[in-house]
C-alpha cells in the first residue's frame, strides 16, 4: 500500500475518488455510516470540510453548526446520520478526536484517498458514470488526481451507474 500513518485501535474506512468533482462519496459515506449504526457500531466521520471558513480546528459538526463553519457536505452527513462529524485538514487529528471524545469504534473518511498521512484499513473508490474522466489524464491536463491504475490498490470500487470498460480493463 502507498500510505503510511499511525494505526488506530479502531478501523478506518476511506471513501474517495480519483477525479475532481462530485462522484458520490458523500452519499456513500451516509449510507455506510447508517448501515454500520444498524449493526450496533458507533461510526464517526472525518472530513476536510471544503468550503469551510473556519479559522480554528477541529470543527465539531452538530445540529447548531452553520455550513459556513464546516462546509455543506459535513453538515449533510451529520444531519442524515446523526453521528459525530469532525472537520479538520489534519485528518489524523480528527480521528483522535472521534475516538477520544465521542467513543467512536469505526471511522469513515469522506474524500480521503489522497490523504496519505492517514492510515486506512479499508479503501473504497467511488465512480459516477456521468462524470467525464477525459482521456484518463492527471491534473492539470485532465480531471484525475492520481493515475487510474491507483484503483488496483483499493479494496472496493462502487460505481453509480455502469463502470466504464476502459476502467475495468486497467484493473
Regions found by a protein language model. Give the residues of each.
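Walker A (P-loop) phosphate-binding motif
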Residues: 2-63, 163, 167
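Phosphate/Mg2+-binding loops and adjacent switch elements
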Residues: 50-170
Amino acid at each position: 500500500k502507498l500510505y503510511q500513518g499511525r494505526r488506530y485501535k479502531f478501523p478506518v474506512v476511506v471513501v474517495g475518488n480519483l477525479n475532481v468533482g462530485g462522484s458520490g462519496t458523500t452519499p456513500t459515506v451516509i449510507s455506510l455510516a447508517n448501515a454500520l449504526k444498524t449493526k450496533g457500531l458507533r461510526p464517526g466521520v472525518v472530513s476536510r470540510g471544503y468550503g469551510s471558513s473556519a479559522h480554528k480546528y477541529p470543527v465539531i459538526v452538530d445540529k447548531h453548526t452553520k455550513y459556513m463553519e464546516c462546509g455543506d457536505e459535513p453538515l449533510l452527513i451529520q444531519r442524515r446520520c446523526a453521528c459525530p462529524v469532525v472537520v479538520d485538514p489534519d485528518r489524523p487529528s480528527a480521528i483522535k478526536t472521534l475516538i477520544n471524545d465521542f467513543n467512536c469504534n469505526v471511522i469513515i473518511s469522506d474524500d480521503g484517498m489522497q490523504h496519505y498521512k492517514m492510515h486506512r484499513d479499508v479503501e473504497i473508490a467511488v465512480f459516477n458514470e456521468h462524470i467525464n474522466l477525459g482521456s484518463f489524464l492527471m491534473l492539470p491536463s485532465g480531471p484525475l488526481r492520481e493515475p487510474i491504475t491507483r484503483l488496483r490498490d483499493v479494496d472496493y470500487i462502487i460505481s453509480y451507474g455502469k463502470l466504464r470498460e476502459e476502467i475495468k480493463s486497467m484493473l
